[in-house]
């Protein structure tokens, strides 16, 4: 009887896990890895790479794809509705990315667009992370704040680059993918690949996993 009871508990536990995974998502997450990837050893985007440091060179579009693929795998495991906007190593145009996002939002009505990037500057001292939304007060602001709150928890020793002039910490810009998407949209700058210390971190598999897990925690919190 004890063995049978333990068996029933085990089956019930597995069923609850499966039912939780099957729970309908509140949102459809449109994940966009910025820039191009690597095809036959050739990087598909001009620029958008670190200097050739002694420890290696970072290609932004490649790193963005690693993070997005990690997030997509986690979403699938959790039953969260997520779509890879590009699903390619080609450098898809901004206009095409926005077109795909808007078509999906027109169908599903519940999309949130998340564009994954890392930052660059002429000075190697520039460092930290930031999140951008379109200009003005929009539904994107709350999404950005949710992601920033999680990033502050995960990366307390790194600089949050922010703009509090409008009462929140996200930065605002007329970036094409933020201005012309019809759903809430944010663009995340995951540190500076032109900064030697941060570039070395961005090349580290464990740090890439940490970035992906950080953004997934934001998604999971918004899905509750």
Language model segments and positions:
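Solvent-exposed loop/turn segments at secondary-structure junctions
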Residues: 35-38, 87-92, 118-123, 136-139, ...
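Active-site histidine-acidic residue metal-binding/catalytic motifs
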Residues: 17-98
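Extracytoplasmic/secreted envelope proteins and their assembly/folding machinery
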Residues: 65-68, 72, 95-98, 128, ...
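Active-site-adjacent mobile loop/cap segments within catalytic or ligand-binding domains
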Residues: 27-30, 104, 113-119, 164-224
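Soluble non-cytosolic domains of exported or imported proteins
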Residues: 58-66, 91-95, 137-142, 202-210
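A short, glycine/acidic-enriched catalytic loop
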Residues: 39-59, 119-154
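Loop/turn elements at helix/coil->beta-strand transitions in domains of secreted/extracellular proteins
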Residues: 25-27, 77-83, 107-112, 154-157, ...
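Short, well-structured alpha-helical segments in soluble
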Residues: 98-108
């Amino acid at each position: 009887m004890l063995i049978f009871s333990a068996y029933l508990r085990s089956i019930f536990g597995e069923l609850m896990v499966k039912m939780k995974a099957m729970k309908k998502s509140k949102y459809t997450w449109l994940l966009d890895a910025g820039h191009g990837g690597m095809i036959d050893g050739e990087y598909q985007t001009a620029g958008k790479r670190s200097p050739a440091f002694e420890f290696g060179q970072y290609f932004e579009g490649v790193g963005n794809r690693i993070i997005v693929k990690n997030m997509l795998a986690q979403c699938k495991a959790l039953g969260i509705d997520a779509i890879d906007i590009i699903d390619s190593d080609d450098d898809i145009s901004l206009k095409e990315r926005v077109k795909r996002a808007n078509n999906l939002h027109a169908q599903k009505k519940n999309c949130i667009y998340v564009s994954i990037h890392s930052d660059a500057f002429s000075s190697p001292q520039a460092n930290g992370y930031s999140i951008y939304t379109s200009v003005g007060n929009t539904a994107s602001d709350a999404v950005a704040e949710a992601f920033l709150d999680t990033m502050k928890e995960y990366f307390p020793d790194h600089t949050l680059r922010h703009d509090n002039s409008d009462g929140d910490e996200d930065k605002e810009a007329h970036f094409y993918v933020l201005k012309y998407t019809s759903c809430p949209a944010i663009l995340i700058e995951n540190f500076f690949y032109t900064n030697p210390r941060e570039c070395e971190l961005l090349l580290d598999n464990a740090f890439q996993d940490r970035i992906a897990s950080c953004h997934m925690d934001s998604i999971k919190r918004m899905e509750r």
